Amino acid sequence: MKKDLLELFDNSFPDRDYTIEIVNAEFTSVCPKTGLPDFGTITIRYVPDKSCIELKSLKYYFLEFRNAGIFYENITNRILDDLVTLLQPRSLSVITEWRARGGITETVSVNYSQTL
């Protein structure tokens, strides 16, 4: 996945704590074991510091996962790592909710918080 696709813009309110929530209800990837498609919803919540993520670039970043054979846990942590590295937010969480396969669903969540 190419994190260099991600673009930022300046936070107009860097002195204020506020939360941005982004939901992608059409995320797709490929199961590395079976080669079958996986479908999920990705929710990103963050408190920006100096920058915010530009949504069109995030959409193209997500599309990079479409044909990638990657486990749910790896996707969730990869997105967090890439966004934290780029944004340097005050806090950020990624929640991935995966549609049922064989009657089983999975939700993976990971959190980051700046240390002062």
UniProtKB/Swiss-Prot annotation:
Pathway: tRNA modification; tRNA-queuosine biosynthesis
Localization, UniProt: Cytoplasm
Enzyme class, broadest EC rank: oxidoreductase
GO molecular function: preQ1 synthase activity
Organism: Pelodictyon phaeoclathratiforme (strain DSM 5477 / BU-1)
EC number: 1.7.1.13
GO terms (BP aspect): queuosine biosynthetic process; tRNA modification
UniProt function note: Catalyzes the NADPH-dependent reduction of 7-cyano-7-deazaguanine (preQ0) to 7-aminomethyl-7-deazaguanine (preQ1).
Top-rank lineage group of the source organism: Bacteria
Record NCBIfam families: QueF-II
Catalyses which reaction(s): 7-aminomethyl-7-carbaguanine + 2 NADP(+) = 7-cyano-7-deazaguanine + 2 NADPH + 3 H(+)
Residue numbers annotated as active site: 31 (thioimide intermediate), 38 (proton donor)
An annotated GO cellular component: cytoplasm
Ligand binding (substrate): 53-55, 72-73
The name this protein goes by in its record: NADPH-dependent 7-cyano-7-deazaguanine reductase
Keyword NADP: yes
TM segment ranges: none
Coiled-coil parts of chain: none
HAMAP family on file: QueF_type1
InterPro entries: GTP-CH-I_C/QueF, NADPH_dep_7-cyano-7-deazaG_red, QueF, QueF_type1
